[in-house]
């Protein structure tokens, strides 16, 4: 009988390892492209396309392959908006240095054509719920930004305010994606626009989500100027008839509240250039004059003149005559040296 040679089905370990390494590289990169393509479909007004991935020689490592992802097409175009160009450059840089963020940065920044498109996408994904879909919110924000271009102008001013005043911030990208004070103000601006359009139930729904997600409670009837920074933001409460003028800095735990049950004009009016320290409570329809400074933990019950510093419970004037905008320098302690701290 003719013998038949038997061959082992076992494959040498070194061959298996080599084969697996070759097979794992391109699929890993392609998986990133697939994820980006899926997320891209959520972005409004972005043409249908796939993420092009540069062909990587097999000798290169998987990490090198990820770092060589090439995003092509007409998203994130160069335009006259310097802030948008900067955001795109920062996003590309972070995607290259940290490939794990490539998918996230593509869906939030690089898949979009403008600041307003990216902002609408970020806010929609932050504020969505099981019964309020991100696609609904994306349409809502996008329509409001197209209808009122001042919303985008104010967003840029707020972004620049954070960059100028917060030493912990070194990229515009951080502000848009990670700073909830900035995000809360931008979402409030859309809620306020809806309120002015007499779409009050929708405005209140949006305000409720802002409060739940960001822990910032701003009534949609409140008026917020541009160049405003909510630093840390947690616990900020701003009532319906409050007015916050331009270039104001507000730290966490601040309340601009009313008193009693009167339903008229009952909330504080904050002048331009004011800085309000952490934990401050300002009650009633009173004016805090421009370029004033309210020390942390103070309770303000009376009007504060312009260019003044007030501290304490209840707050009292400790300095008058400061002309520089303290909101820009974030200086909360100068002018307090002469106080008697003895108890």
Predicted regions and their residues:
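Structural signal for interior beta-strand "rungs" in well-ordered beta-sheet cores
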Residues: 211-318
């Amino acid at each position: 009988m003719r013998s038949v040679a038997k061959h082992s089905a076992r494959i040498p370990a070194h061959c298996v390892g080599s084969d697996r390494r070759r097979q794992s590289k391109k699929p890993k990169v392609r998986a990133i492209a697939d994820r980006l393509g899926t997320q891209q479909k959520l972005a409004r007004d972005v043409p249908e396309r796939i993420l092009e991935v540069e062909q990587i020689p097999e000798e290169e490592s998987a990490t090198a392959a990820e770092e060589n992802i090439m995003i092509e097409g007409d998203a994130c175009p160069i335009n006259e908006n310097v802030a948008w160009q900067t955001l795109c450059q920062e996003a590309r840089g972070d995607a290259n240095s940290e490939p794990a963020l490539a998918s996230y940065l593509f869906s939030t920044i690089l898949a979009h054509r403008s600041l307003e498109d990216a902002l609408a996408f970020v806010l929609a994904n932050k504020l969505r719920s099981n019964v309020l879909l991100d696609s609904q919110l994306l349409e809502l924000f996008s329509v409001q930004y197209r209808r009122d271009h001042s919303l985008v102008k104010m967003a840029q001013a707020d972004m620049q305010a954070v960059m100028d005043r917060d030493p912990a911030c070194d990229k515009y990208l951080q502000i848009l994606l990670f700073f909830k004070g900035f995000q809360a103000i931008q979402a409030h601006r859309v809620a306020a626009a809806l309120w002015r359009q007499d779409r009050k139930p929708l405005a209140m729904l949006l305000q409720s989500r802002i409060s739940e997600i960001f822990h910032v409670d701003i009534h949609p009837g409140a008026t917020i100027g541009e160049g405003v920074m909510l630093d840390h933001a947690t616990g900020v409460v701003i009532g319906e008839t409050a007015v916050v003028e331009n270039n104001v800095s507000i730290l966490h735990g601040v309340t601009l509240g009313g008193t009693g049950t009167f339903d008229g004009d009952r909330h504080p009016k904050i002048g331009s250039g004011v800085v309000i320290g952490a934990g401050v409570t300002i009650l009633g329809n009173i004016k805090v004059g421009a370029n004033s400074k309210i020390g942390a933990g103070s309770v303000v019950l009376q009007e504060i003149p312009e260019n003044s510093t007030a501290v304490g419970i209840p707050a009292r004037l400790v300095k008058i005559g400061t002309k520089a905008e303290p909101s820009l320098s974030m200086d909360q302690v100068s002018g307090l040296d002469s106080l008697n701290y003895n108890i």
